């Protein structure tokens, strides 16, 4: 979905005659820069390794937000006990018990309501197992994005269009602007101002 609608053009300094292809291409460029398929709320799945002795992980896509009428952005979570790597065993007798019951390698469903999360940082704090065993890997299905596209994203979209329209190689073309053309000039179109507006939405890692 495009981040600017025709009714928005006057408010963000774009001529009313701006065609949809400019907005569509600018929207695609924003998604590419933020390393995510969309800034609207959609579902993601990540598999993450936990640091030894720590029961927290950080998700890539922010902000965490429920989809539609959902009450939580956490759809499902599974934790797994794996054989620790060298230097990771904190309680060797406890791990020996776990191995005796064949726990390593098994995925266990966690109640999403038992997991604390920060919607702005994407940090999850996992509960401990009843035996006191830490998980060392989790698979998280969650939703993240903007329920309402804000002024920062709309301003970024408009600025990219203005930058593109002032780029001679793009503006001189009489054909429709497409995403590939915009990507070629992305280093100049996504200027420092645009980067500042989009910084909160850039994925923490490549997805």
Model regions and ranges:
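Divalent metal-cofactor coordination and adjacent catalytic microenvironments
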Residues: 1-207
